[in-house]
Amino acid sequence: MDEGTGLQPGAGEQLEAPATAEAVQERCEPETLRSKSLPVLSSASCRPSLSPTSGDANPAFGCVDSSGHQELKQGPNPLAPSPSAPSTSAGLGDCNHRVDLSKTFSVSSALAMLQERRCLYVVLTDSRCFLVCMCFLTFIQALMVSGYLSSVITTIERRYSLKSSESGLLVSCFDIGNLVVVVFVSYFGGRGRRPLWLAVGGLLIAFGAALFALPHFISPPYQIQELNASAPNDGLCQGGNSTATLEPPACPKDSGGNNHWVYVALFICAQILIGMGSTPIYTLGPTYLDDNVKKENSSLYLAIMYVMGALGPAVGYLLGGLLIGFYVDPRNPVHLDQNDPRFIGNWWSGFLLCAIAMFLVIFPMFTFPKKLPPRHKKKKKKKFSVDAVSDDDVLKEKSNNSEQADKKVSSMGFGKDVRDLPRAAVRILSNMTFLFVSLSYTAESAIVTAFITFIPKFIESQFGIPASNASIYTGVIIVPSAGVGIVLGGYIIKKLKLGARESAKLAMICSGVSLLCFSTLFIVGCESINLGGINIPYTTGPSLTMPHRNLTGSCNVNCGCKIHEYEPVCGSDGITYFNPCLAGCVNSGNLSTGIRNYTECTCVQSRQVITPPTVGQRSQLRVVIVKTYLNENGYAVSGKCKRTCNTLIPFLVFLFIVTFITACAQPSAIIVTLRSVEDEERPFALGMQFVLLRTLAYIPTPIYFGAVIDTTCMLWQQECGVQGSCWEYNVTSFRFVYFGLAAGLKFVGFIFIFLAWYSIKYKEDGLQRRRQREFPLSTVSERVGHPDNARTRSCPAFSTQGEFHEETGLQKGIQCAAQTYPGPFPEAISSSADPGLEESPAALEPPS
């Protein structure tokens, strides 16, 4: 630098700044353990010295901003600063302090952000995190579809006047939506980013769940007409009005009867959306897990996912039983017992809860990549390269296997062209073993579908318990028994190492035993209640038969009763009446327990003791008249008459046994299905079985079971000319029809699994006979070594290891004897036997 230039740096001085910075960095190179573990401390510790030391006579001071430019430079011969200039040491201190703080904050914030992003990336690319999301997704879907909906279906029927066949249609729409998109999702989703497809499916499920709850918010509020103090005679018999007749129900424009099909359409659309959204869960989710984890961990991950799916229905039944114990409108609670048929439970809140939970679960699904990177263990650093190679090898092995499978499938005619699809379908369906086991599995699946859908309704109507308790009993009995049965069936197959033939025999035995156990369900039940005007007459005239059902009689024909609201009362004669008006009751009052008491009931004139009819008198009722004490007319209390039936516990025990034995056959059916086709045909065979199950079991079963159940109804809801839900069933007919149809399906399944077992046996026996014809046994040693020979079974040493093995069983036996008893005699036998034994394989060759 020229002396006349003062403090202005020249071109050569600007080049000295990087050298000074490098010198500062060289003095800061040594790192400590703390600086390595905490990079922020390392960057903050490397600072140039602000004061000259004794060892540095001509120090260079510099202030470098964030852009790397030098603000102040002092050469080896510094000039004295001007009086107006600030102190050099003070300026340098402020500059370095500001730069150090900015560097510290910027570096620390950047490192913290990078660390957070790295942690988030590691979490969202971990197969275990995907497994957790997949488990919750499967759990919520199974909870809502297989458990919660079945537990609240009877409540929805009463609220929106649905028949059992219509509610069965709602259940079937889930599988309809599933069947519509399964080919599209499986084909395009398998080649795309599968977690994204799962997330979109979760969105559809959430929207469908919210849509299912929409009728509660758009329908008129549910109202119950109760007697109050302002109108004490409302709903009672107006005996003074001789011209009063039965009044038809009023039909306002916004009534539920006029909008009946609107609500049904909303339910159907919601179920179809849920079915479409559920398709990727069981088609893309398992394949994504299997393709992105090690082969030895794949089965464990899939087992955890399916266990969560199995727990969903149980929790769904329990959740439904809990929620429908509350009134449907929390803002307007009523004081009604759950046994009152007018009580409607809170059915809609569970769908909103499932929708919210599904929204929370699917957000991480959007972030998972198309392919997860291999996961390595951090603790074992020495084996890092080995682990990486093993993971890559596993993934390469899976891809190679898939490519080889595609080549084999293409060579057999599968997957080449869409036009080959009919030929492939005919090839699969012409396999009698596969066809028989698929039809048997379809019949069993139809029974399971009928049980899951309508068993809460059966328990509620058969034993007269609230819908909430029926749902809880179903969740406690059905789901655990099915889970234990499936696990036991799989354990038996693994423990005994059963093949296709033995697995078919196990399934046949389980089907036969469960068919016999069905007989217990017919005899364990209750009798129908005596409902005045429906299954028992009002008066005791000369004829005690019921030629037709009529709610009116001589005792209530002039009361002007309304018949659109079912408000049962129990008369002192042990008969249940439709409402207090039809019982002929004139006065009412509240008891201390909250139960309403009705007096002066003209239809309850005498106490009738009903005895069971004798054989041949099923249509007649034997009535014993006993005069009522204290008053001429009878009295009644609100609610149905209690039934003396104590068979609920035995029924639940027998139901557990039947479900358990039926579930034991499911793993056997799957094994027979996989073993009955070639390895290359298995994916297409499972797809064909999927279509058979949906079209023959899952879709039609709820509809025709619901239609058959409707035939047992003895009291229908009538609202605005629309026949709504069933108020009372003939529970005896319900029991025989329901379990009779299920037993018929069980018998059909037994026949088909027997045919599947016989077809396997026929094929194996035919193959064995063909081998015997092609390779006849000509020598004594071969006959002794044959597995069917008695000597071979008693002495395994003589059995052969193969058809063309050089060392036969007889030769091994001679060598064993020579080693055990050494001497000239065994050696002579061995040497003389060798030439003959060497020729034995030639005898197995087919004759020319």
From Swiss-Prot:
Stretches assigned to the Cytoplasmic side: 1-128, 190-195, 291-309, 370-427, 494-497, 675-683, 761-808
Biased composition (Basic and acidic residues): 24-34
Disulfide bonds: C555-C585, C561-C581, C570-C601
An example molecular function term from Gene Ontology annotations: sodium-independent organic anion transmembrane transporter activity
Comp. bias intervals (Polar residues): 40-56
GO cellular component: basolateral plasma membrane; intracellular membrane-bounded organelle; plasma membrane
Lipid bilayer topology: Multi-pass membrane protein
Region listing for Disordered, in residue ranges: 1-91, 821-848
CDD domains tied to this protein: MFS_SLCO5_OATP5 (cd17404)
Transmembrane segments: 129-149, 169-189, 196-220, 261-290, 310-329, 345-369, 428-449, 470-493, 498-521, 652-674, 684-709, 743-760
Stretches of the chain found on the membrane's Extracellular side: 150-168, 221-260, 330-344, 450-469, 522-651, 710-742
Coiled-coil ranges (or none): none
Compartment(s): Cell membrane
Domain named Kazal-like: residues: 549-603
GO BP annotations, alphabetical order: sodium-independent organic anion transport
Residues linked to a glycan: N228, N241, N469, N550, N590, N597, N730
Subcellular location, principal: membrane
Family according to the record: Belongs to the organo anion transporter (TC 2.A.60) family.
PANTHER family for the chain: ORGANIC ANION TRANSPORTER, SOLUTE CARRIER ORGANIC ANION TRANSPORTER FAMILY MEMBER 5A1
Official protein name in the record: Solute carrier organic anion transporter family member 5A1
Organism: Homo sapiens (Human)
